Structures are given as structure tokens and as C-alpha cells.
Amino acid sequence: MSSAQRKDDHVRLATEQQRAHSGRNQFDDVSFVHHALAGIDRPDVRLATTFAGITWRLPLYINAMTGGSAKTGAINRDLAVAARETGAAIASGSMHAFFRDPSCADTFRVLRTENPDGFVMANVNATASVDNARRAVDLIEANALQIHLNTAQETPMPEGDRSFGSWPAQIAKITAAVDVPVIVKEVGNGLSRQTLLALPDLGVRVADVSGRGGTDFARIENSRRPLGDYAFLHGWGQSTPACLLDAQDVGFPLLASGGIRNPLDVARALALGAGAVGSSGVFLRTLIDGGVSALVAQISTWLDQLAALQTMLGARTPADLTRCDVLIHGPLRSFCTDRGIDIGRFARRSSSADIRSEMTGSTR
């Protein structure tokens, strides 16, 4: 099967997953404590976020999806238009197809041509050569480079890689060689605390935990196998909220993606420490079903609703959500117990003094 056919398969199967999804994931195990006098005035709310010296107008980004075929190039064009119209940052899908076949360059370059002033991230795997990583950045004039980690995808992939031991050293080489920030990310199986703590030694200063709960690439690749004999890998890894809880105080900025279904999930991820939050599968489904205008409307609605949540919770900025009290329930609570995570600290982050301050600082 050609690389272009595989990319088209990924889009089809990811969209089918979104349509069949049960709707529940571990973000439902995170709830805000409601303080009825904590609210502020909507004009006081801002959505801009800053992490690792990078400032985005919005704490929401369109995460890595696709590229490498005529069909996926058209999808990338529409995604770029949506990013341009809303101000959201955007990431390319894996650019490995471009390294194999430079004739598909325009399916990735369109992310920049349609969005000349936006924040665009290139995307390579951990086996990419330094030269190819630079080519990826140059092709789309990228502002940052994502390096994706995907052992649980490669393992069931019929044509997948089976050699992972060189990845840390190669990440270090790429990070040292490119002139843009590097963001190491998973593809939906999560980054553990141990993995995150290893990244600074490789020169990495930002990570996207990209946990379980959204598109399941192990399931996608297994469905491409004649016997479907890797079904036991479906649902592998840690959820996005589990990763964020596991990563408390790692000492460098984190982004969050994987299983983001609505603005409340965005707020939950920000409250657990993410500097910004990405979505892929939900946005892809909206684009496929309704076109670029529907996606622009969805992103705009999410941003308006996120600002409404911040207003109700008393968070003037996305970062202020980390001062809001949250409760951890169900299986996520069990994960925290097993990993030795003190969840009580999240339930007692605000104080009555905070609420009194908001009352005296706003007109009721």
C-alpha cells in the first residue's frame, strides 16, 4: 500500500472512530468545585496563553492530523483556513510522506500558504534525520517542530517500525540542530512522568502529553491488519488527565491533547496544568461532515464558551484556572492513588480570601 493510500485510510478510520465513540472518557472524572461568588466580569477575561517564551492568542490549537495525498492536502487547506480565521495555532500531520515522495510537498505547504501569519508546527517522527527535520521546518516555515512518539501505533502497523532504541539520541540530535522550539508529543497513548523527566536531558523544553481518550491509532492500525490480531492494544496507555496529574511539578511547560470533546474538557486540562489544549479528531469530523465554515463556527463557539467558563470560575486568564478547586473521581482517582499523587491539593487550591477579593474587585 502506498503512503498516500495509508494517509487516506487514517482519515477515514479516524472519522469512523469519532462517529462510533461512546462519548465518555476520563475527563469526566474531573469536576470543578462550584463557588457561587467566584465569578468575574466577562470583559476582564483574556484567552491568551504563554509557555516556554511562546505566546498564543488562544489556548486552543488544531493538533496534528494529516497530509501526503491529494485528499489530505485538501483537508490541510481547510484546516489552515480555519486556523487563519480563528487565530488558532495549527500542527501538520507527520511529514514522513514528504521525505519519501517530495511531490506531495504542497499537501503540507498549504498549511503556510493559506495561513501566512499563523503559528504553524511541523511534525516528524523520532527516526527522522536531522536533515529531514530541517526540511520539514523549512517547507512550511514552521514556528515550532513536533516530534511524535508512537510505539503503540508502530507495533500493530503492518509496515511499522520495530526498532525504538535509537529514539532518545535522535531526539537530542534534532533538538540541537533545528532553529525552532521542539515539542515532543505522543499520538494518543500518553506521556508518563518518567518519560517527561527524561526530556530535558535531550534538550526538550515543551511536551504535549497527548493521552488516551480520543483517536486510537493502535485500533486504526489493527483494523488494517488482515486478522486484526492486535486488538489487545486497543485503549493502550494513560488518559490525558492522568498524564497531567502524573506530571505535576515536572519543571517545564506541558500542552494537552487527546480526548478533548468540548470547552469544558479544555478548561479541565488547563486547570490540571496544561499551557494550551489541542484537538484533532473532533475537528476532523466537523470538517468532514460540515466543511470549513462549520469548523470555524465550532472553534469560535468553543472559545466563547471557554471564556464563559473562565468568567464563572473567576479565572481572568487560562493560567488562572490552575487556582480553581477540582475534584478527582472514579478510575482516575484510583490511578492517582497507585501513582502516589496527592489529589487533595487540587481540591483546596482556592480560598475564601480569593472569593472575597473577587467580590470587592467587581461590581455585582
From Swiss-Prot:
The keyword Mitochondrion does not apply. It is found in: Cytoplasm. InterPro entries: Aldolase_TIM, FMN-dep_DH, IPdP_isomerase. Residues 1-13 have a biased composition (Basic and acidic residues). FMN binds at A64, M65, T66, S94, N123, K185, S210, T215, G259, I260, R261, S280, G281. It is an enzyme of class 5 (isomerase). Its cofactor is FMN; NADPH; Mg(2+). Transmembrane segments: none annotated. GO terms for cellular component: cytoplasm. Its EC number is 5.3.3.2. Residues 1-24 are annotated as: Disordered. Substrate binds at R6, K7, S94, M95, H96, Q153. Homooctamer. Dimer of tetramers. Belongs to the IPP isomerase type 2 family. This is Isopentenyl-diphosphate delta-isomerase.
